[in-house]
C-alpha cells in the first residue's frame, strides 16, 4: 500500500516533532481518525439546533428567512421542487406545507382565522384546542359546526370536582354524558343548566366518597394515634384535652411484661460483670429507676468499684466490652473514652434495648432519689415529663450530644415550672385535674416568655430563679443557653452542653401554637355541633405527637421476648413506695455543700448554736469578750443564695453586682448573733 504524501511545511514539522516527544504507548494507541460517536453526536446537535431555533422564534422569523413559503389559502408554494415539505440546510424536514400548524402560525395575527370543522361533541366538551383555534392532527370524523355555540355552551371549561378516589365513577359519568349529548331533542336541557344539574346530582355520590375519606382518616388516626379513645361528654375543651393526655400516658407507660424483660436484661448483664470482676457492684439509674422511660429509652447502668481495686480505666472499658460481646450480650459496641463521662454503648441482641454503662459515677444514684422525691410532691410531674420527652424525641432533641435536653434537664424544667406556678402555689388550681392547661402553659413559658439570656433555674429550697451573670454561668458568645443548677451538686450546670437550645425553644413555641389553634377549632365545633359530638372528636395531642411504626414494632418484639422467656410478673412500684430524697428537707451537707471551718485562736466552740454556724470564742487584749462569726458556706451556697432573683422581676434583672458582696467576718454581740442565725434559717 502506498504512503500518503504529506506537504513538508513548518506546521506539519512541529506536529511530527511533538508526536515524537510523546510517550511510546500514547503514540502507539493514538488514533487520528475522528470518532464515529462524536460525528453522530454533532449531526444530532446540528439537527436539533434548527428545530430549537424554530421553536424559540415561534415559527415566524425562521419561516421568513427561508425561501419556500406557504401562503394562506393557496395550495402552491414558491418552491415547487420540494412538494413534501420545507427542509432546512441540514436536510431536516421542518413541517409539511399542508400542515395546519404552519398555516395558522404564519397567519397575520390581526386577521381573524376561520374556525376549522370539528366534531360537535368536541365543541360541546369545550376542549382547549377549540379555544386556541388549532385542530388536532388525529381528529375524529369532522362534521359541519352549527352556529349554536352559545346554546351548547362551547366556551365552558369544566372542572373536576371529584377526588382521586372516584376515578371509576368519573369515567362512567363521562360516558353517560357523552351518550346524552349525542341525543338532540327539543326538550334537551341547555348546557349550563346541565352542568350545574350534574354537579348537584352528584351530591349523593360525593357523600359516599366522603364516607370513604372519613374511614381512611380514622384508620390513619388509629395507626398514628393508638392511644386515642372516645372522650367523655365535656363542654370545656380543657377537660377534653386532659382526657387525651390521660389516654396517652396510659398507652405509653411500659407494661409489666416490658418492665420484666428489662429487669431480666439487667440481671443477665450483672451476672456477666460479676463473672469478670467479682468485687464490683452494678446499679441501675436514670429513667428506668424513676419509671419515666419511654418504650425505646436507653438502659443506664453504673459500675461502682471498691477503693482498693479501682475499675474504670480505658483498658477496663475495652476488656468489659470484649467480654460482653464474647457472651453475645452486646452488639454494635461503642467504647467512648473521650467524653466527660466515659461510657460503653451497646445493643442487646435479644431484646434490641440500648444500654449505657458508666464507671464510678454515684451522682446518678442520688439524682434518682431526688427525682423520686419530686414525683411524690408534684402529681403532674410524671405525665408532663413523659409528654415532653416524647415530643422532643420525635424531633431528635432529647439527646445532649445532638444539642437537645437530657431527661434530667426536662425534669428540672417541669419541677421549676410547677414550683413557681402562681395558681398552684396558692392552691387555686389542682394539678391532678389540669394536665392540659399545665402542658400549654409549660410550652408557652419556655417557648415564648422565658428570658434565657439572663435567668437561671434552681429547684432546691422551694425553687427560684437566679442571675446567670452573678453566678458566673453567662457565656458572652452563647448567652441564650439554658442554665439549671443541679440540686445534687450546686457547681454543676445540668444543661450546659445543650447547644441546640434555640431549636428546643422554637419547638416549644410551635407546639403551643398548634395546640392552641386546635383547641380553638374544637371549641367552635362544640358550639356548632353540640356537646353530644364530643366523643367522636379526634385526638388533640395528635397535632404534636404520634407513634411511629418503629415504636409499635419494638413493643411487639418485647412482648415476644417475654413470651419466649416468661418470668413472674411484678406490679409496677407506686410512686409513693419509691426511695426518695426531699431536697427541701434534706440537710445541706447531703446535697453536695461542703462546710469549711476557718482557723481560730481558740479551740472552744459553742455547741448550742445553729448547725449552719459555728462561733469561736476569743479573748482580746482589752478583756472584753467578743464573738467571731464565720459563715461556713461553700461557693455554691453563696452563689445560690446571694444571686437569688425575684420571680416577679424575672425579665428586669439589675446588672448591679454590689449586692453580691456579703461580709464573711464581723464582730457582733451574742444577741445579734442569734437574730442573724434566725434570718439565715428562714432563707433556707
From Swiss-Prot:
The record's Pfam families line, in alphabetical order, gives: MTPAP-like_central, PAP_assoc
The protein's required cofactor(s) are namely: Mg(2+); Mn(2+)
**PAP-associated domain boundaries:** 434-492
Query: Which residue stretches does the UniProt record annotate as biased composition, category Polar residues?
Result: 628-655
- Catalytic function, reaction form: RNA(n) + ATP = RNA(n)-3'-adenine ribonucleotide + diphosphate
Cross-referenced SUPFAM superfamilies: Nucleotidyltransferase (SSF81301), PAP/OAS1 substrate-binding domain (SSF81631)
For this chain's UniProt record, which GO biological process terms are given?
A: mRNA processing; nuclear polyadenylation-dependent antisense transcript catabolic process; nuclear polyadenylation-dependent rRNA catabolic process; polyadenylation-dependent ncRNA catabolic process; priRNA 3'-end processing; RNA 3'-end processing; siRNA catabolic process; sno(s)RNA catabolic process
Ligand binding (Mg(2+)): 298, 300
The region called Disordered is annotated at 1-52, 64-127, 161-219, 623-684
InterPro entries found in the cross-reference section: MTPAP-like_central, NT_sf, PAP_assoc, Trf4-like
Q: Where does ATP bind?
A: 364, 389, 407-408, 492, 496
Keyword vocabulary terms for this entry:
ATP-binding, Magnesium, Manganese, Metal-binding, mRNA processing, Nucleotide-binding, Nucleotidyltransferase, Nucleus, RNA-binding, Transferase
Query: In its keyword annotation, does this UniProt entry include Membrane?
Result: no
Per the UniProt record, which EC number(s) apply here? Answer: 2.7.7.19
Q: Matching PANTHER family, A to Z?
A: INACTIVE NON-CANONICAL POLY(A) RNA POLYMERASE PROTEIN TRF4-2-RELATED (PTHR23092:SF15), POLY(A) RNA POLYMERASE (PTHR23092)
> Family per UniProt?
Belongs to the DNA polymerase type-B-like family.
Task: State the protein's name.
Answer: Poly(A) RNA polymerase cid14
Lineage runs: Eukaryota, Fungi, Dikarya, Ascomycota, Taphrinomycotina
Amino acid at each position: 500500500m502506498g504512503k500518503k504524501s504529506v506537504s513538508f511545511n513548518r506546521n506539519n514539522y512541529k506536529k511530527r516533532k511533538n508526536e515524537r516527544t510523546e510517550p511510546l504507548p500514547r503514540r502507539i494507541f493514538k488514533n487520528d481518525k475522528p470518532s464515529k460517536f462524536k460525528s453522530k453526536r454533532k449531526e444530532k446537535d446540528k439537527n436539533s439546533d434548527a428545530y430549537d431555533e424554530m421553536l424559540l422564534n415561534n415559527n415566524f422569523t425562521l419561516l421568513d428567512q427561508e425561501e419556500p413559503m406557504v401562503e394562506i389559502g393557496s395550495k402552491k408554494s414558491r418552491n415547487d421542487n420540494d412538494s413534501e415539505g420545507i427542509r432546512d440546510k441540514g436536510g431536516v424536514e421542518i413541517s409539511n406545507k399542508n400542515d395546519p400548524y404552519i398555516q395558522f402560525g404564519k397567519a397575520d395575527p390581526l386577521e381573524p382565522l376561520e374556525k376549522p370543522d370539528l366534531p360537535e361533541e368536541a365543541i360541546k366538551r369545550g376542549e382547549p384546542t377549540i379555544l386556541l383555534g388549532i385542530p388536532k392532527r388525529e381528529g375524529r370524523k369532522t362534521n359541519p359546526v352549527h352556529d349554536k355555540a352559545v346554546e351548547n355552551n362551547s366556551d365552558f371549561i369544566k372542572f373536576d370536582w371529584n377526588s382521586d378516589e372516584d376515578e371509576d365513577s368519573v369515567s362512567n359519568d363521562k360516558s353517560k354524558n357523552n351518550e346524552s349529548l349525542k341525543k338532540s331533542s327539543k326538550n334537551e336541557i341547555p348546557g349550563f343548566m346541565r352542568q350545574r344539574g350534574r354537579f348537584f346530582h352528584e351530591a349523593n355520590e360525593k357523600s359516599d366518597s366522603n364516607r370513604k375519606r372519613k374511614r381512611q382518616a380514622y384508620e390513619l388516626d388509629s395507626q398514628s394515634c393508638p392511644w386515642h379513645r372516645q372522650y367523655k361528654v365535656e363542654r370545656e375543651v380543657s377537660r377534653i384535652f386532659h382526657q387525651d393526655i390521660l389516654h396517652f400516658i396510659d398507652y405509653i407507660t411500659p407494661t409489666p411484661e416490658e418492665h420484666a424483660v428489662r429487669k431480666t436484661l439487667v440481671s443477665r448483664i450483672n451476672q456477666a460483670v460479676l463473672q469478670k470482676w467479682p468485687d464490683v457492684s452494678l446499679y441501675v439509674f436514670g429513667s428506668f429507676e424513676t419509671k419515666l422511660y419511654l418504650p425505646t429509652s436507653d438502659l443506664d447502668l453504673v459500675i461502682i468499684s471498691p477503693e482498693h481495686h479501682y475499675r474504670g480505666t480505658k483498658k477496663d472499658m475495652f476488656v468489659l466490652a470484649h467480654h460482653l460481646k464474647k457472651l453475645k450480650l452486646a452488639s454494635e459496641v461503642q467504647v467512648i473514652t473521650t467524653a466527660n463521662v466515659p461510657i460503653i454503648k451497646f445493643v442487646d441482641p435479644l431484646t434490641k434495648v440500648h444500654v449505657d454503662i458508666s464507671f464510678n459515677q454515684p451522682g446518678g444514684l442520688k439524682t434518682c432519689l431526688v427525682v423520686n422525691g419530686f414525683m411524690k410532691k408534684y402529681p403532674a410531674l410524671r405525665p408532663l415529663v413523659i409528654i415532653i420527652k416524647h415530643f422532643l424525641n420525635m424531633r431528635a432533641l432529647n439527646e445532649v450530644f445532638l444539642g437537645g435536653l437530657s431527661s434530667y434537664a426536662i425534669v428540672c424544667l417541669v419541677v421549676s415550672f410547677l414550683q413557681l406556678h402562681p395558681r398552684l402555689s396558692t392552691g387555686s388550681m389542682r394539678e391532678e385535674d389540669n394536665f392540659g392547661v399545665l402542658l400549654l402553659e409549660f410550652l408557652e413559658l419556655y417557648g415564648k416568655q422565658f428570658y434565657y439570656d439572663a435567668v437561671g433555674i434552681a429547684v432546691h429550697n422551694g425553687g427560684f430563679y437566679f442571675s446567670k451573670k452573678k453566678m458566673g454561668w453567662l457565656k458572652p458568645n452563647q448567652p441564650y443557653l439554658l442554665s439549671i443548677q443541679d440540686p445534687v451538686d450546686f457547681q454543676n450546670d445540668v444543661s450546659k452542653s445543650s447547644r441546640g437550645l434555640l431549636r428546643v425553644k422554637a419547638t416549644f413555641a410551635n407546639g403551643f401554637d398548634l395546640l392552641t389553634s386546635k383547641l380553638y377549632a374544637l371549641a367552635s365545633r362544640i358550639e356548632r355541633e353540640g356537646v353530644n359530638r364530643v366523643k367522636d372528636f379526634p385526638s388533640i395531642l395528635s397535632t404534636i405527637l404520634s407513634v411511629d411504626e418503629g415504636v409499635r414494632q419494638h413493643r411487639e418484639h418485647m412482648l415476644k421476648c417475654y413470651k419466649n422467656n416468661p418470668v413472674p410478673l411484678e406490679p409496677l412500684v407506686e410512686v409513693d413506695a419509691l426511695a426518695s430524697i426531699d431536697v427541701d428537707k434534706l440537710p445541706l451537707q447531703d446535697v453536695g455543700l461542703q462546710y469549711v471551718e476557718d482557723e481560730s485562736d481558740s479551740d472552744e466552740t459553742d455547741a448550742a448554736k445553729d448547725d449552719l454556724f459555728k462561733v469561736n470564742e476569743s479573748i482580746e487584749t482589752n478583756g472584753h469578750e467578743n464573738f467571731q462569726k464565720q459563715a461556713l458556706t461553700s461557693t455554691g451556697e453563696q452563689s445560690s443564695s446571694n444571686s437569688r432573683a425575684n420571680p416577679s422581676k424575672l425579665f428586669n434583672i439589675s446588672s448591679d453586682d454590689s449586692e453580691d458582696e456579703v461580709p464573711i467576718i464581723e464582730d457582733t454581740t451574742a444577741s445579734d448573733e442569734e437574730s442573724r442565725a434566725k434570718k439565715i434559717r428562714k432563707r433556707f
